[in-house]
């Protein structure tokens, strides 16, 4: 049986960009959100083989440490011409300093080396797996994706991560050029475009009630 989120919720991330997006998505539901960083929680090793298992690892670790329901996202970009890379290693490609400019440059260099210059050779998709874990090990898990094409040079300064080089299908602008409302569909969430917002819509249907 599904379980509703009430009261305080730990957001199990130390990524400022991801934290801001999650708080924005949670805002209509009146949830008191506190980050793992604010609580001084350490980051667990992400040893899973896919996005869903890594999200669960982070949520469970935060729930056990904080004794509170904890919400985690594991997301990344999957590039067809790079055999699915960077995938679950998307954050690691940015290194310890979270240098996504360098990570995007690395992707572009690899695409050029493989001759992937035409739009149909530059297909990619973002994946977001969301997990809410309770201290008693109850889990609620969802996953979503958004397909698109990689552009170069990167465009826009909104969002974070690989957003400036990802143009979602059916649009002329990158995520980096879109406002939060355009990217997340806020409000209403039913218009969600991004992978994280689409996953959040699924999670909200089973775990959240608007205030």
Swiss-Prot record:
Coiled coil: none annotated. GO terms for biological process: nucleoside triphosphate catabolic process; nucleotide metabolic process; purine nucleoside triphosphate catabolic process. Its EC number is 3.6.1.66. It holds the Pfam family Ham1p_like. One of its GO terms (molecular function) is XTP diphosphatase activity. Homodimer. This is dITP/XTP pyrophosphatase.
